[in-house]
Amino acid sequence: MTLSLEQLSARMRQGEDIPLSDTARIALALSIPSILEQLVVTAMEYIDAAMVGHIGAEATAAIGIVSSSTWLLHGILVGLYTAFSIQIAQYLGADRRQDARGVLRQSMLFNLILGLGAAAFGVGISRFLPGWLGADISLQADASAYFAIWSAALPFTMAMGMYTAMLRATGDALTPSLISVLVCALDVVFNFFLINPTRQIQLFGQSVTVWGAGLEVPGAALGTALSTTIGGLLALGVLLLRDGPLCIRKPGSWRITSACLRNLWRVGTPLAAERAALSSAQVLLVRIVSGLGTVAIAANSLGVSAEGLCYMAGYGIQDASIALIGQAVGAHRRDMAKRFAWLCTMMGIGIMALSGMGLWLFAPALMGIFTADAAVIALGAQVLRIEAFAEPMFGASIVASGAMQGAGDSTGCFVLNLFSMWGVRLTLAFLLAPRLGLVGVWAAMCIELCIRGALFLIRLARGKWLDKGALQ
């Protein structure tokens, strides 16, 4: 019988020696729902991208131009709100439930204030952003509309990410997965009606008229915004109505505490800076790619979507590692934190090695899902096969960084990611793009991911990431 995370935490606090088989089972129990969630999410994103891709290469390129900016803005918010879920995991590991509920209440205030501010900022710059990124004039109207609509939904996007992360911190990986799957399914349904115009389709041999708004690229953004709004409200509803360690209906203060702010600064600021550094580097990479032509822009954007099939499994395991190691550190069990870190990291490497093999074998077929443009398919398949070789080490960096974040060592993650992305990937891409085009950009990415994985494994082996200790 698999232990619950709550039972495991109690045994760790009592100083019990937990058998390896039990730790492996609970790691799998937390990882599998998250992995399946990420795979379903990626599959739905494939369908989403395919719906836009079949409008034409220009529609894909319009979204691709602003995609790095959506990563930047969303990434900063993710870095900040991840600090709340790490605090909750460590407090629950220490059996400080009242403190955990206090963090939850403060996170709701944070979500409201920062989410609305980020939405206003994104909508405000949307008109000018495509021009700043060097987009062709023919792409700017669609790119601007997409970014504005996406930005308007940020409070709900943030709520969904924050509250599902907190549910995972309690050991509930299933509910967040179900919410995410529902959101992705709704996204596809909304896109079906919002992207396409009213048309005739064949259903069971009969011609049926299906209504459509015909909004094309703005319709894709609106579908995403509506579905994530529903997801954010569902995640909030679960936390408001559920009993358990985070039952917010129990009496408690909504006052913002100095301890929460200190922990947010200590963990959240480096995480936000890391996301900003990675995402701003992606913006510069898109700027480099935007000078290579519409085919390269479309192949790059769709290639990133296709590669998601590989690394999303790694992020599923990362979610589990943050919760497991956060609770182990909260229980003051360094030995268990190390065990979980290596166990999860090896799982990530193994799964992403297998998915990398699949990426290499099926690269043309994956690109064919998104677009019928032969030139985009050929170039996209070529760069995906380059990237396939980096997947195992990318898995190492994803999961090891989650382990370090769970222990509160977000500064170490920031430094390693900053060096690898800015010192290696951007430098190589700048040098190789004029000579090799998009192939050079993706070769730089492959080299950088291998170096990044090696750096994270070295830091994991040295053990200094555990010196941060439990949060205040």
Task: Please give the residue ranges for each predicted region.
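Small-residue-enriched core segments of transmembrane alpha-helices in multipass membrane transport
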Residues: S180-D187, S305-G308, L418-T427
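Short alpha-helical transmembrane segments in multi-pass integral membrane proteins
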Residues: M1-S34, I88-P155, L186, Q202-T269, ...
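Small-residue-rich hydrophobic transmembrane alpha-helices
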Residues: T60-A120, T157-P176, V286, A299-M357, ...
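C-terminal structured "cap/appendage" subdomains that terminate the fold
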Residues: A400-G437, A443
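Transmembrane helical elements of multi-pass membrane transporters/channels
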Residues: A29-D48, I149, M160, S227-G231, ...
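N-terminal transmembrane alpha-helices
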Residues: I18-A50, H54-I55, S68-Q87, L112-A119, ...
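Alpha-helical transmembrane segments of multipass membrane proteins
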Residues: Y46-A50, F128, M162-M166, V188-F193, ...
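Helix-terminus/linker motif at the lipid-water interface of multi-pass membrane proteins
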Residues: L39-A61, P130-I137, F193-T198, S207-L215, ...
